[in-house]
Amino acid sequence: RGEAVLAWKLVVFSAAPLGDFLTLVGATSGKLLLQENRIAFDTGSALVYAPNPIQESGNLGLSDAGDAASNALDNARLAVTLLGLDPGIGTLKGEYVDLVGLAGGLAVPDADEVSRVYNYDRADDRFEQATIYHSIDSIQRYFHSLGFDDDTGAVNGIRDFPTLAHAHWNTADQSFYSTG
Protein backbone atom coordinates (compact mmCIF):
# COMPACT_ATOMS: atom_id res chain seq x y z
CA ARG A 1 0.00 0.00 0.00
CA GLY A 2 3.01 2.28 0.09
CA GLU A 3 2.71 3.42 3.72
CA ALA A 4 5.25 2.95 6.48
CA VAL A 5 4.10 0.69 9.31
CA LEU A 6 5.85 -0.08 12.58
CA ALA A 7 6.48 -3.84 12.64
CA TRP A 8 8.14 -6.60 14.59
CA LYS A 9 10.72 -8.56 12.61
CA LEU A 10 11.14 -12.24 13.46
CA VAL A 11 13.79 -14.46 11.89
CA VAL A 12 13.48 -18.17 12.58
CA PHE A 13 15.91 -20.85 11.41
CA SER A 14 14.12 -24.19 11.34
CA ALA A 15 15.00 -27.78 10.51
CA ALA A 16 11.37 -28.94 10.30
CA PRO A 17 10.03 -27.43 8.17
CA LEU A 18 13.37 -26.57 6.61
CA GLY A 19 13.77 -22.86 6.21
CA ASP A 20 15.11 -19.46 7.12
CA PHE A 21 11.80 -17.72 7.79
CA LEU A 22 11.39 -13.95 7.81
CA THR A 23 8.15 -12.77 9.40
CA LEU A 24 6.92 -9.20 9.79
CA VAL A 25 4.05 -8.57 12.22
CA GLY A 26 2.32 -5.21 12.59
CA ALA A 27 3.37 -3.75 15.96
CA THR A 28 0.00 -2.16 16.65
CA SER A 29 -2.39 -4.38 14.68
CA GLY A 30 -0.74 -7.75 15.34
CA LYS A 31 -1.53 -8.67 11.72
CA LEU A 32 0.84 -10.79 9.67
CA LEU A 33 2.38 -8.42 7.13
CA LEU A 34 4.89 -10.74 5.48
CA GLN A 35 6.11 -14.28 5.86
CA GLU A 36 8.58 -15.90 3.53
CA ASN A 37 11.14 -18.65 3.49
CA ARG A 38 14.46 -17.16 2.45
CA ILE A 39 16.46 -20.37 2.33
CA ALA A 40 18.08 -21.18 -1.00
CA PHE A 41 16.77 -24.46 -2.35
CA ASP A 42 18.34 -26.40 -5.21
CA THR A 43 16.81 -27.25 -8.56
CA GLY A 44 17.11 -30.39 -10.63
CA SER A 45 15.73 -31.83 -13.83
CA ALA A 46 13.80 -34.97 -14.65
CA LEU A 47 11.88 -36.79 -17.32
CA VAL A 48 8.35 -37.32 -16.01
CA TYR A 49 4.78 -37.94 -17.04
CA ALA A 50 2.87 -34.68 -16.78
CA PRO A 51 0.10 -35.55 -16.40
CA ASN A 52 0.16 -39.02 -18.00
CA PRO A 53 1.26 -40.73 -21.24
CA ILE A 54 -2.25 -41.21 -22.65
CA GLN A 55 -3.15 -37.56 -22.26
CA GLU A 56 0.25 -36.44 -23.56
CA SER A 57 0.23 -38.71 -26.64
CA GLY A 58 -3.50 -39.10 -27.32
CA ASN A 59 -2.87 -42.84 -27.77
CA LEU A 60 -5.66 -44.72 -25.96
CA GLY A 61 -3.99 -48.05 -26.75
CA LEU A 62 -1.06 -47.60 -24.38
CA SER A 63 -0.74 -50.20 -21.65
CA ASP A 64 1.44 -50.59 -18.59
CA ALA A 65 2.98 -53.97 -19.52
CA GLY A 66 4.45 -54.41 -16.04
CA ASP A 67 6.39 -51.12 -16.06
CA ALA A 68 8.31 -52.20 -19.15
CA ALA A 69 10.01 -49.44 -21.11
CA SER A 70 8.75 -48.84 -24.63
CA ASN A 71 9.33 -46.19 -27.26
CA ALA A 72 5.73 -44.97 -27.06
CA LEU A 73 5.77 -44.62 -23.27
CA ASP A 74 9.28 -43.17 -23.08
CA ASN A 75 8.40 -40.62 -25.78
CA ALA A 76 5.49 -39.39 -23.63
CA ARG A 77 7.90 -38.20 -20.91
CA LEU A 78 8.47 -34.47 -20.56
CA ALA A 79 11.64 -32.71 -19.43
CA VAL A 80 10.84 -30.60 -16.35
CA THR A 81 12.68 -28.58 -13.73
CA LEU A 82 12.37 -29.88 -10.19
CA LEU A 83 12.11 -26.97 -7.76
CA GLY A 84 12.72 -26.64 -4.04
CA LEU A 85 15.12 -29.56 -3.55
CA ASP A 86 16.92 -29.62 -0.20
CA PRO A 87 20.54 -28.49 -0.63
CA GLY A 88 23.45 -30.83 -0.11
CA ILE A 89 21.69 -34.13 -0.84
CA GLY A 90 20.83 -35.98 -4.03
CA THR A 91 17.50 -37.50 -3.01
CA LEU A 92 14.05 -36.19 -3.85
CA LYS A 93 13.37 -34.30 -0.67
CA GLY A 94 12.39 -30.68 -0.73
CA GLU A 95 10.27 -27.75 0.28
CA TYR A 96 6.88 -29.42 -0.42
CA VAL A 97 7.65 -33.12 -0.98
CA ASP A 98 9.70 -35.74 0.88
CA LEU A 99 10.16 -39.08 -0.87
CA VAL A 100 12.73 -40.43 1.62
CA GLY A 101 11.28 -39.68 5.05
CA LEU A 102 8.37 -42.16 5.07
CA ALA A 103 9.38 -45.51 6.57
CA GLY A 104 7.89 -48.72 5.16
CA GLY A 105 6.86 -49.80 1.72
CA LEU A 106 8.69 -51.94 -0.79
CA ALA A 107 12.48 -51.96 -0.79
CA VAL A 108 13.43 -50.05 -3.93
CA PRO A 109 16.43 -47.77 -4.41
CA ASP A 110 15.90 -44.05 -3.83
CA ALA A 111 16.41 -41.64 -6.69
CA ASP A 112 19.73 -40.23 -5.46
CA GLU A 113 21.61 -38.13 -8.00
CA VAL A 114 24.33 -35.70 -6.89
CA SER A 115 24.05 -34.17 -10.39
CA ARG A 116 20.33 -33.47 -9.74
CA VAL A 117 19.45 -35.04 -13.10
CA TYR A 118 16.74 -37.68 -12.67
CA ASN A 119 16.31 -39.02 -16.21
CA TYR A 120 15.05 -42.58 -15.91
CA ASP A 121 13.06 -44.74 -18.28
CA ARG A 122 9.84 -46.14 -16.90
CA ALA A 123 11.33 -49.59 -16.25
CA ASP A 124 13.47 -47.99 -13.52
CA ASP A 125 11.70 -47.81 -10.13
CA ARG A 126 13.14 -44.34 -9.61
CA PHE A 127 11.09 -42.97 -12.54
CA GLU A 128 7.91 -42.98 -10.45
CA GLN A 129 9.72 -41.10 -7.66
CA ALA A 130 10.68 -38.26 -10.00
CA THR A 131 7.14 -38.10 -11.41
CA ILE A 132 5.57 -38.02 -7.94
CA TYR A 133 7.98 -35.33 -6.72
CA HIS A 134 7.19 -33.12 -9.70
CA SER A 135 3.42 -33.69 -9.46
CA ILE A 136 3.04 -32.91 -5.74
CA ASP A 137 5.51 -30.02 -5.80
CA SER A 138 3.81 -28.45 -8.85
CA ILE A 139 0.36 -28.70 -7.28
CA GLN A 140 1.51 -27.13 -4.00
CA ARG A 141 3.30 -24.30 -5.83
CA TYR A 142 0.19 -23.65 -7.93
CA PHE A 143 -2.05 -23.44 -4.84
CA HIS A 144 0.42 -21.11 -3.14
CA SER A 145 0.53 -18.91 -6.26
CA LEU A 146 -3.24 -18.47 -5.90
CA GLY A 147 -2.75 -17.16 -2.38
CA PHE A 148 -3.74 -20.30 -0.49
CA ASP A 149 -1.59 -21.53 2.37
CA ASP A 150 -1.71 -23.62 5.53
CA ASP A 151 -2.38 -20.60 7.74
CA THR A 152 -6.15 -20.51 7.22
CA GLY A 153 -6.83 -22.78 10.19
CA ALA A 154 -8.93 -25.21 8.19
CA VAL A 155 -7.45 -28.47 6.97
CA ASN A 156 -7.31 -27.76 3.25
CA GLY A 157 -4.44 -29.80 1.82
CA ILE A 158 -2.38 -26.67 1.18
CA ARG A 159 0.84 -27.31 3.03
CA ASP A 160 3.71 -25.12 4.09
CA PHE A 161 5.73 -28.23 4.88
CA PRO A 162 6.75 -31.35 2.93
CA THR A 163 4.16 -34.00 2.10
CA LEU A 164 5.56 -37.45 2.86
CA ALA A 165 5.19 -39.70 -0.18
CA HIS A 166 6.31 -43.19 -1.17
CA ALA A 167 6.31 -44.23 -4.82
CA HIS A 168 6.34 -47.95 -4.03
CA TRP A 169 4.32 -48.51 -0.89
CA ASN A 170 2.93 -51.81 -2.15
CA THR A 171 2.20 -53.62 -5.41
CA ALA A 172 -1.49 -52.66 -5.51
CA ASP A 173 -3.06 -49.66 -7.25
CA GLN A 174 -1.54 -46.66 -5.51
CA SER A 175 -3.75 -43.93 -6.91
CA PHE A 176 -4.97 -42.74 -3.53
CA TYR A 177 -4.11 -40.19 -0.87
CA SER A 178 -4.33 -40.72 2.87
CA THR A 179 -4.12 -37.96 5.48
CA GLY A 180 -3.16 -40.48 8.16
Regions found by a protein language model. Name each.
Residues 1-180:
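Zymogen propeptides/activation segments of proteases
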